[in-house]
C-alpha cells in the first residue's frame, strides 16, 4: 500500500505539469538559445517558402523551353537545305525515261549490228561442221567426240561476246539514269566508245569461232587419214591368209625340181619279203 501511493504520486505530477520547454541554465550557449525559435512568425515563413519555390520553378521552366526551341530551329534550318539539294539532284520521272530511252538507242544500234554479224558467221560455220561430222561417223566412231567438242566450244566462244555486249549496255543504262541532261550529252561519246569496244569484242569472238572451225576441220582430216590407214592395214591382213593357202596348194600339186621321187615301190617290195618269210616257217 505504501509503495502504491508513492508510485501514483510520482506519476501524477508530470501529467498535471504544462508541457513547456525545459528551463535554460545560466551557462547555456548562444546556438542553443537561437535554435529554440525561428525568426518571425510561422505564417511569414510559409509565404517566404512559397515565393522562393514559385520563382525557382518558373525559371527552370523558362530555361527548358528556350533550349528546346533553339534545338528545333537548328534542325529546321539544317533540314531545309538538305531537302532543297535532294529536290535539285532528283530529276523528274519524265526526264528519267527520256534519258533511258536515248541511252538504249545509242547502245542498241552498234550492238545489234555486231550481234547480227556474229550470228551470220556462226550460221555459216555450223553447216560446214554438220557436213564434216557424217563423214567422220562413217570413218570412225571415236573421232566424233573431239569434233563435237570443238563445235560446242566455237558456239560458246561466239555467245560470250553477245553476253558481254548486253551486260555493258545494261550497266551504262543504269548509270545514266540519275544523271541530268547535260551529263548525258557529255557521256554520249564515251558510250559510243564502249559500243565500239563491244563490236570489237564480237569480231574477236567471230575470229575465235573461225579458228575453232579450222581446228575441227584439221581434226576431221587427221581422222580420215587414220581411217584410210586402218582400211589399208585390214586389206593386207585379209589378203595374206588367202595368198598363203594358194601357195601351199601349188606346192603340194607340183613338187620342186631336183626333189627325189616318192618311195612307194620300195615299201611294196619290203612287204612282199616279210610275207614270204612268215610263210616259209609255217610250211
UniProtKB/Swiss-Prot annotation:
Keyword Transmembrane helix (UniProt): yes
Inactivation phenotype: Reduction of mitochondrial motion in the anterograde direction and increase of mitochondrial motion in the retrograde direction in response to hypoxia. The number of motile mitochondria is not altered. Neocortical neurons exhibit a remarkable increase of the dendritic number and the axon length. Neuronal cells show an increase in the percentage of round mitochondria and a decrease in the percentage of rod or tubular mitochondria.
Transmembrane segments: 42-64
Region annotation Disordered: where it falls in the sequence: 1-36, 78-101, 118-283
Any single Pfam family the record assigns to this protein: AIF-MLS
Domain of life: Eukaryota
Ranges of Low complexity composition bias in the record: 128-160
UniProt biased composition (Basic and acidic residues): 221-245
UniProt cross-references to InterPro entries, sorted A to Z: MGARP (IPR026093), MGARP_N (IPR032773)
Stretches in topological domain Cytoplasmic: 1-41
Assigned GO CC terms: axon cytoplasm; mitochondrial inner membrane; mitochondrial outer membrane; mitochondrion
One GO-annotated biological process of the protein: anterograde axonal transport
Signal peptide start and end residues: none
Described purpose of this protein according to its UniProt entry: Plays a role in the trafficking of mitochondria along microtubules. Regulates the kinesin-mediated axonal transport of mitochondria to nerve terminals along microtubules during hypoxia. Participates in the translocation of TRAK2/GRIF1 from the cytoplasm to the mitochondrion. Also plays a role in steroidogenesis through maintenance of mitochondrial abundance and morphology. Plays an inhibitory role during neocortex development by regulating mitochondrial morphology, distribution and motility in neocortical neurons.
Name assigned to this protein: Protein MGARP
Source organism (scientific name): Mus musculus (Mouse)
Amino acid at each position: 500500500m505504501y509503495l502504491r501511493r508513492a508510485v501514483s504520486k510520482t506519476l501524477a505530477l508530470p501529467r498535471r505539469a504544462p508541457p513547456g520547454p525545459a528551463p535554460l541554465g545560466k551557462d547555456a550557449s548562444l546556438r542553443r538559445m537561437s535554435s529554440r525559435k525561428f525568426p518571425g512568425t510561422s505564417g511569414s515563413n510559409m509565404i517566404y517558402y512559397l515565393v522562393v519555390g514559385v520563382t525557382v520553378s518558373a525559371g527552370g521552366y523558362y530555361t527548358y523551353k528556350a533550349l528546346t526551341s533553339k534545338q528545333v530551329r537548328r534542325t529546321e534550318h539544317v533540314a531545309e537545305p538538305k531537302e532543297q539539294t535532294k529536290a535539285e539532284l532528283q530529276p523528274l520521272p519524265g526526264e528519267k525515261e527520256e534519258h533511258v530511252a536515248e541511252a538504249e538507242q545509242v547502245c542498241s544500234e552498234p550492238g545489234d549490228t555486231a550481234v547480227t554479224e556474229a550470228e551470220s558467221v556462226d550460221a555459216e560455220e555450223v553447216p560446214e561442221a554438220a557436213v564434216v561430222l557424217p563423214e567422220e561417223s562413217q570413218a570412225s566412231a571415236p573421232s566424233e567426240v573431239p569434233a563435237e567438242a570443238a563445235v560446242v566450244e566455237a558456239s560458246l566462244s561466239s555467245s560470250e561476246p553477245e553476253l558481254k555486249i548486253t551486260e555493258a549496255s545494261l550497266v551504262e543504262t543504269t548509270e545514266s539514269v540519275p544523271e541530268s541532261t547535260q551529263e548525258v550529252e557529255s557521256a554520249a561519246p564515251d558510250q559510243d566508245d564502249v559500243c565500239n569496244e563491244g563490236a570489237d569484242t564480237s569480231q574477236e569472238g567471230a575470229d575465235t569461232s573461225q579458228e575453232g572451225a579450222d581446228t575441227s576441220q584439221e581434226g576431221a582430216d587427221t581422222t580420215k587419214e587414220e581411217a584410210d590407214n586402218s582400211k589399208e592395214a585390214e586389206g593386207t591382213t585379209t589378203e595374206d591368209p588367202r595368198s598363203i593357202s594358194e601357195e601351199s596348194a601349188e606346192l603340194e600339186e607340183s613338187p620342186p625340181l631336183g626333189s627325189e621321187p616318192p618311195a612307194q615301190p620300195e615299201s611294196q617290195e619290203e612287204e612282199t619279203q616279210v610275207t614270204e618269210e612268215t610263210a616259209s616257217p609255217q610250211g
